């Protein structure tokens, strides 16, 4: 049972100025003490150098003492000791105590000078000295995080990356680039490049700088030829043009943006997504799916041209991964298209890492109408050649008002109804919904994935549901 809430402060009472006066001056000291203590945290790689500094200082002092007494500086050392004698008081402040005080002052001066040199160097690199220990601790911690490969596109993938970057910097996002609408479609047609839109969203999600993220996502509202484009899309198009292709420009992009992790297109070859429908029709172009699929349904999707190649960096990341996450995102336009690239599908099939499918919260009008969770998993298995080891499904309830709004558009909640025993054994439940929306909460989703990775997966039971 939770504790009762604390009573509200008595605003009628005068403030305790004595306590305030005593607290304010100590706050900077407390913050400095906390920062100093953080330098001693495990894993920073700092304590070993502090220990080496202490040992070398002691050895150097002893060696210098030996040199002064046995070498040409002996007369000077004698004069120095005689001069210090005037500060000694026999029985009260002996000569050795004077030496200890001088030694402590010298050591403090040396440490102060080293600190100021470090602060000057940090300022020169653009790092605030006050936050240096926090940045170092964060980067060291994140560098030991899970090696995870995410596959997908759209808002779902960028949401996932926003949450994952607080747990690990060993992230590789493999992004579907078959979009042919909007700014991406215009740049793709004009420059014969892959669609950059979802790549831009992922770079913004992994950015350490909120200002840079806003800049990448800025969409021009005016200007001939610029209207409708985002700055990030234009940046990727510029680097692709300058380097002769997006594949060769990826390293430059990562160095410029300095994001946590890596973002790669599923292929650097412009491809068109083709849907084969149950009524025998074929639709070419992702942007046409939502309008032209109804009243039929998608049986399969494929790429034109077939068998595009994948980047070597993507295949290496899949081989080294400790977890492969599919989604969240549109089943037929974000997740499966990346799995249609033979090299990626083969690498995922052969990977010893668990494959986790993050199920959508709702069906998508015009794309997954009438499909159950079993249909989603079967579609992935059919295109990939491997069944996901785990299926992560939200057990949070969508607010009725939000649910009604989606139902008016033809979307329904995706549930476990009708699932077989095998699928039920793979499902893991967790509260994943962002309050007031029908979207995954980035932090909740990342925490659920980390729980799967950290130890034996925990099963959450849906209210009123039985296997």
Swiss-Prot record:
Q: Does the keyword Cytoplasm apply?
A: yes
Please provide the Gene Ontology terms (biological process) for this protein: regulation of cell shape
InterPro entries in UniProt: CofD, CofD-like_dom_sf, Gluconeogen_factor
Q: What does this protein do?
A: Required for morphogenesis under gluconeogenic growth conditions.
Going by the entry's taxonomy, the superkingdom of the source organism is recorded as Bacteria
Which PANTHER family does this one have? GLUCONEOGENESIS FACTOR-RELATED, UNCHARACTERIZED PROTEIN YVCK-RELATED
* Pro residues composition bias: residue spans: 1-12
An annotated GO cellular component of this protein is:
cytoplasm
Tell me where in or outside the cell this protein is found. Cytoplasm
Q: Name one Pfam family in it.
A: CofD
Which key words are in the record?
Cytoplasm
Q: What is this protein called?
A: Putative gluconeogenesis factor
**Does the keyword field hold Cytoplasm?**
yes
CDD domains, alphabetized: YvcK_like
Listed SUPFAM superfamilies? CofD-like (SSF142338)
Region annotation (Disordered) ranges: 1-27
Similarity remark: Belongs to the gluconeogenesis factor family.
Q: Which GO terms describe its molecular function?
A: LPPG:FO 2-phospho-L-lactate transferase activity
């Amino acid at each position: 049972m939770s504790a009762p809430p604390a009573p509200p402060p008595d605003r009628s009472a005068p403030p305790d100025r004595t306590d305030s006066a005593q607290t304010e001056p100590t706050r900077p000291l407390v913050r400095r003490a906390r920062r100093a203590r953080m330098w001693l945290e495990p894993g920073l790689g700092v304590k070993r150098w502090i220990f080496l500094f202490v040992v070398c200082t002691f050895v150097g002092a002893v060696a210098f003492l030996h040199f002064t007494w046995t070498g040409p500086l002996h007369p000077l050392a004698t004069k120095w000791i005689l001069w210090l004698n005037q500060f000694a008081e026999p029985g009260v402040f002996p000569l050795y105590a004077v030496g200890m005080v001088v030694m402590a002052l010298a050591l403090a001066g040396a440490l102060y000078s080293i600190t100021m040199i470090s602060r000057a160097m940090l300022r020169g690199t653009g790092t605030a000295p006050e936050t240096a220990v926090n940045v170092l601790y964060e980067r060291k911690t994140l560098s030991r995080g899970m090696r995870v490969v995410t596959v997908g596109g759209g808002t779902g993938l960028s949401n996932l990356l926003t949450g994952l970057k607080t747990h690990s910097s060993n992230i590789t996002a493999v992004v579907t680039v078959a979009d042919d609408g909007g700014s991406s479609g215009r740049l793709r047609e004009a420059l014969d490049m892959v669609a950059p839109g979802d790549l831009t969203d992922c770079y913004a999600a992994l950015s350490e700088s909120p200002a840079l993220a806003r800049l990448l996502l800025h969409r021009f509202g005016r200007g001939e030829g610029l209207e409708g484009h985002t700055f990030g899309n234009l940046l990727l198009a510029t680097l692709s043009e300058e380097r002769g292709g997006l594949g060769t420009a990826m390293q430059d992009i990562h160095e410029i943006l300095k994001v946590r992790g890596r973002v790669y297109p599923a292929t650097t070859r412009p491809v068109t997504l083709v849907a084969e429908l149950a009524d025998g029709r074929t639709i070419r172009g992702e942007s046409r799916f939502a309008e032209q699929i109804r009243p039929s349904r998608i049986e399969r999707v494929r790429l034109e041209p077939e068998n595009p190649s994948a980047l070597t960096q993507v295949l290496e990341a899949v081989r080294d991964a400790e977890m492969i996450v599919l989604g969240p995102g549109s089943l037929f336009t974000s997740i499966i298209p990346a799995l249609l690239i033979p090299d990626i599908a083969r690498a995922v099939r052969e990977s010893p890492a668990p494959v986790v499918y993050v199920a959508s919260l709702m069906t998508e009008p015009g794309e997954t109408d009438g499909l159950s969770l079993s249909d989603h998993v079967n579609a992935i298995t059919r295109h990939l050649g491997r069944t996901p080891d785990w299926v992560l499904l939200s057990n949070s309830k969508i607010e009725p008002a939000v649910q009604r709004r989606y139902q008016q558009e033809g979307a329904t909640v995706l549930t476990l109804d009708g699932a077989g025993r095998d699928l039920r054994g793979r499902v893991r439940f967790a509260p994943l919904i962002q309050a007031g929306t029908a979207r995954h909460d980035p932090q909740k989703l990342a925490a659920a994935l980390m729980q799967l990775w950290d130890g034996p997966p925990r099963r959450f039971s849906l209210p009123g549901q039985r296997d």
